[in-house]
Amino acid sequence: MLTIITPCCRPANLQQLFNSINFTHVNRWLIVHDTTHTNGVFKGVFNHPKITEFGVSGGISGNPQRNKALDQVKSGLVYFLDDDNIIHPNFWEIVPRLNIGYFYTFDQQRWDEFVGKPGDIFKGDTPRLQKIDTAQYIVPFYMCGTWKEDDYKADGLFIEDIYNKNKVSHIYIPEVACYYNYLRRPTK
């Protein structure tokens, strides 16, 4: 089963994330609110049996929040869903094909000019720093390390470490199965 981890500093976006999740394939969705600027206080958004919400202060880019959520996971596959994104519909087509013995990467639909022109595809075939985005991988919990809490590039370092330790367990799925910052894309 799949555990989704969302570090959250934009609670207004959570309903859109919720609407993109197929809970049939999800064991738990862990939402970790960044309470750095709220004196440790947060207001939970959902009352759902598969959703757990809690708060953590400090760090950058949601990294301490991801680590705290990983403390709650014991097994299964893990997917990191940022609070400025939603899950791509194709994601739910690949999830039933996944095996706990491997970590997976896939392609991403971009809205910026990072890979060329807006709308181009960012390949997920290179799980290395600055070659992949957080939304482009699913990993078994037992392969997970911790996120560097004070490093903006922690997502790339996290997956690169997994890749370096488990190269023979990497499967690249050459399909678009995620977006890049979908909720921040330009709209016309």
Describe the function of each predicted region.
Residues S57-Q72:
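Glycine-rich, basic loop-to-helix element that forms the pyrophosphate-binding segment
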Residues V26-T38, T52-S57:
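Short beta-strand/loop segment that forms part of the nucleotide-sugar
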Residues R110-F114, A135-Q136, I173-K188:
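Active-site donor/metal-binding and catalytic loop motifs
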Residues S75-I86:
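Short beta-strand-to-loop acidic/aromatic patch adjacent to the donor-nucleotide binding site
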